[in-house]
């Protein structure tokens, strides 16, 4: 049954997700991407929720910007309940919603100290450039046109997990790569030079060894060989 000017009420699973009711939401997997999806259209909300779950995201779906602020604990400047346990990696919201537009929700999030670093993606069925530019200038991470496709969701999820994967691979490469050899000290360099014995021939320059006048060559050939001990 619709309330609040035609905005659909939260389903039971959504109520559990934001802590309404007797049941408590299960603890979040630290490695699982948690997405807050905001859309006043029940059909669009179901579609985006299913697409996100296909990509192994945990999804909390709400039907208005005010509900999103309540979940984040940003309504009336209140602190979020159990803020340390609350983990939101991405907020994806529709632009045209009654009561509070996606643009207004974006501004509220970016003005907060707790969630201003969380990526916010805006969805809309209308391709209006002024609207897109305004959202991007306000800090939106991306602007998706409806209907949202699975490829769009996969791209957003890979963007969110890219830093973690690169860091893990970087640490792995650092562990497997042997460290470079230490630089030689001045003492070791001197010891190395002292231990090297150079041949007398190596002291002669190449040009000197090849340069000999004809007179010198003739004198060497014509000089008699003398045996040792003979005068």
Curated annotation (Swiss-Prot):
GO function terms (MF aspect): phosphorelay response regulator activity
Keyword Transcription found: yes
GO cellular component, one term: nucleus
Induction / repression: By cytokinin (zeatin) and nitrate.
Taxonomy, superkingdom: Eukaryota
Residue ranges with Low complexity bias: 185-199
Family: Belongs to the ARR family. Type-A subfamily.
Functional note: Functions as a response regulator involved in His-to-Asp phosphorelay signal transduction system. Phosphorylation of the Asp residue in the receiver domain activates the ability of the protein to promote the transcription of target genes. Type-A response regulators seem to act as negative regulators of the cytokinin signaling.
Name of the protein this chain belongs to: Two-component response regulator ARR3
Species annotation: Arabidopsis thaliana (Mouse-ear cress)
Gene: ARR3
């Amino acid at each position: 049954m619709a309330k609040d000017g035609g905005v659909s009420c939260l389903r039971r699973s959504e109520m559990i997700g934001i802590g309404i009711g007797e049941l408590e939401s299960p603890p979040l997997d630290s490695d699982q991407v948690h997405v807050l999806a905001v859309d006043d259209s029940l059909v669009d909300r179901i579609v985006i929720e299913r697409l996100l779950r296909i990509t192994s995201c945990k999804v909390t779906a709400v039907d208005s910007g005010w509900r999103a602020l309540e979940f984040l604990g940003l309504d009336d400047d209140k602190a979020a309940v159990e803020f340390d346990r609350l983990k939101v990696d991405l907020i994806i919201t529709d632009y045209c919603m009654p009561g509070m537009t996606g643009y207004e929700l974006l501004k509220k999030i970016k003005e907060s100290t707790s969630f201003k670093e969380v990526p916010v993606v805006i969805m809309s069925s209308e391709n209006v450039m002024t609207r897109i530019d305004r959202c991007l200038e306000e800090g939106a991470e991306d602007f998706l046109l409806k209907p949202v496709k699975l490829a769009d969701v996969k791209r957003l999820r890979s963007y969110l997990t890219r830093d973690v994967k690169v860091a893990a691979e970087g640490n792995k490469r650092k562990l497997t790569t042997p460290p470079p050899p230490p630089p030689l000290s001045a003492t070791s360099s001197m010891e190395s030079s002292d231990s090297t014995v150079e041949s007398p021939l190596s002291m002669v320059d190449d040009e000197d060894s090849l340069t000999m006048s004809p007179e010198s060559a003739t004198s060497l050939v014509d000089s008699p060989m003398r045996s040792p001990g003979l005068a």
